[in-house]
Amino acid sequence: MTIAEIKNTVEGKMDQSIEAFKHNLTKIRTGRANPALLDTVHVDYYGAMLPISQVANVSLLDARTISVQPWEKGMGAKIEKAIRDSDLGLNPSSMGDLIRVPMPAMSEERRKELSKVVRGEGEGAKIAIRNLRRDANEAIRKAVKDKLASEDEQKRCETDIQKVTDRHVIVIDQLVAAKEQDIMAV
């Protein structure tokens, strides 16, 4: 693998790590309603456990309420039970064929707890980025050892990869700060 290929590959993988981190952040509850919050909740649909989004229309009713509109009449009670039994601390209420899921206000203690979870997720993402940097640097050293690149190219490439790593770590820090601010907002 050439030096340029190594640099492009590591940058692509770092971008994927950032996207995965962003996806993980959407699952962490803030004070506002977010339909993605119910992505982790699965409901029994004729023997198969499916995400709610595959058996109902999930949307926002207002800033603090998620509405779930089942596609089949008989699924309302099952969806309501699945949401109630999830560990999200939500209490859905059924209004005919529409299920309303109000978001309860979080206590200060719960906000701090979620803030710690966000920081932990951020640290995990940074570790993933650093591991990618380490793997890329090892691949570069191997290329130099196999006489596919010079030592000058190695130093230049390692510097470039460090800059890319620093950029991605800054993005993670910004995402963590924004999510913490979102969580701590009353």
Curated annotation (Swiss-Prot):
SUPFAM superfamilies the UniProt entry points to: Ribosome recycling factor, RRF
Q: Which GO terms describe its cellular component?
A: cytosol
Using the UniProt record, give the first listed, main subcellular location: cytoplasm
Q: Which InterPro entries match?
A: Ribosome_recyc_fac, Ribosome_recyc_fac_dom, RRF_sf
Query: Where is it located?
Result: Cytoplasm
Q: Which Gene3D superfamilies match?
A: 3.30.1360.40, Ribosome-recycling factor
Matching entries from CDD domains are given as: RRF
Membrane-traversing stretches: none
Among the Pfam families in the record, one is RRF
The record's Gene Ontology biological-process terms are: cytoplasmic translational termination
What GO MF terms are annotated? ribosomal large subunit binding
Q: What does this protein do?
A: Responsible for the release of ribosomes from messenger RNA at the termination of protein biosynthesis. May increase the efficiency of translation by recycling ribosomes from one round of translation to another.
| Similarity comment: family membership | Belongs to the RRF family.
HAMAP family from the UniProt entry: RRF
Name of the protein described by the UniProt record? Ribosome-recycling factor
State the organism named in the record.
Albidiferax ferrireducens (strain ATCC BAA-621 / DSM 15236 / T118) (Rhodoferax ferrireducens)
The record's gene field reads frr
